[in-house]
Amino acid sequence: MATTKIKKGDSVKVIAGKDKGKEGKVISVSNGKVLVEGVNTITKHSKASQANPKGGIIHQEAPIDASNVMYVQKGKTTRIGFTTVDGKNGQKKVRVAKATGDIID
């Protein structure tokens, strides 16, 4: 599996699925899945326990596949590529927005 070009903290837009068109910030990335703030929310019913004496209904985000989100820069979606730049310790690989050519990080 290829490495994910989306990183934690990126602004993304959902391009496929039931939440298509929604935007949010990436909370976490793991195994090709991303957790996006306010997107793909599920309802969990928790039973009362010693740790959670009240129990109840919890709403939380569920992971979606990284291929279903696109990076958002200046209000527009763009693909992400990689390039190398010269640094003080040799060359460094950085992410680049394909639409504008701007370095992301």
From Swiss-Prot:
Keywords: Ribonucleoprotein, Ribosomal protein, RNA-binding, rRNA-binding. The keyword RNA-binding applies. GO terms for biological process: translation. Pfam families: KOW, ribosomal_L24. PROSITE patterns: RIBOSOMAL_L24 (PS01108). One of two assembly initiator proteins, it binds directly to the 5'-end of the 23S rRNA, where it nucleates assembly of the 50S subunit. This is Large ribosomal subunit protein uL24.
